[in-house]
Amino acid sequence: MTTTHDQTAAKIPKRVIWLAVAGAVGGFLFGFDSSVVNGAVDAIKDEFALSEAVTGFAVAVALLGCAAGAYLAGKIADRYGRIPAMKLGALLFLVSAIGTGFAFGVWDLIFWRLVGGLGIGLASVIAPAYISEISPRHVRGRLASLQQLAITTGIFAALLSDAVFATSAGGADQALWLGLEAWRWMFMAAAVPAVVYGWIAFTLPESPRFLVFQGKDEEALRVFKSIAPDEDSDRHLREIKKAIDEDKLAGQKGSLRGKALGLQPVVWIGIILSVLQQFVGINVIFYYSTTLWKAVGFQEKDSLTISVATAVTNILVTLVAIALVDRIGRRPIMLAGSIGMALSLGTMALAFGSATGSGDAISLPGAWGPAALVAANVFVISFGASWGPLVWVLLGEIFPSRIRARALGLAAAAQWIANFAITLSFPVMAAASLPLTYAMYALFAAASFFFVMFKVPETNGMSLEQAETLFVPKGSAKEAAKESAKESARA
């Protein structure tokens, strides 16, 4: 039987799809940048005669730039608009791609990586904010999930381009074109998506919700009608203006400050969601992937095949999330994902508890090798179909419009810092005890289940203004203002 919801959800305006895909290109830059360095890191280390510590910092410093860019993104987007923030992100990423390709020493390479990080941080915030603000409520989950799909596609594209350059030159450290080594071309290839993203930004309309906050109601109405002509644009405009009036009545301004340790409770919810997404260890789970695949017959030389297979898996499971998120909701998918991650990480902790040897010589006896391999892939599937895309969906819709960009920026900055902390701490923790490291990630996965269970309400099918009301504390000025507005309407 087809429900009314299904019938409505099937009608997605083509222009909305285009705008969401265009906005998600920032996620492609995010994924490309996070993966492109993998094919170049060994060549960079040899080129500049770097120590392990300096090499690690040169790779990870982009994450600090991302954190700074994400934090600044909210302020830039609220002051100048979502589209100018996109253009700035594209410009920074373009400059970084060219600068890194022509780096003459490790310190200017680090500088250009930092600049690129600023651009990626901007893009990581603006994409989910923009997509959520232009998407109809019945398909917002699917369209917002395009951010994660773009990230995984960017990772896949970077893996392929790295392989093409390295193979063509006979190695990442070998000269390819114009006397420049292949690793330099790997970074300069990022200029292509940066230019595309910048060009797209010049074709996109500004977020209608930002326009309303700027007092440009007529322009906002035109944007609403252009992106979804079958929707009730006047009603959307009234809902946004009503939310603004309620905020004014409650004396609330665009501040993140609150009584919960200095921040509003909803801001903490966004920060904790972001941190948990990283603290389950997704970015380091395949640190020993070669060992796992060797346990079932693969050779070390098959690492590219392994990486590509993982990237394709990420893309496919993200498509599953896109198909389900507006049908069954955010909470059920995230809760199921948390269970899958906790169980698979726990299995990996047990498997590595029986390991012999250390470092590259580590081995898993008997059935533990295949068990760990299966568990690692179950983890990737569980994460990719739930917490990977849906955290971005929630970050785009749980924050009130007056603070959305800044709150999303702070949450994304926390995510990048958590990513940096996990990336730097994993080698040290793994050397001390790999089983305990995976057990710690399993505990964070279990914690993610209870956090969603008790702190994250369902937002499926709601407008952004309706979703905002789910996070209003009882007895707050905002709630009082809403009740006052209702009484005035009755009178």
Regions found by a protein language model. Name each.
Residues M1-A491:
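Transmembrane-helix signature of 12-pass secondary carriers
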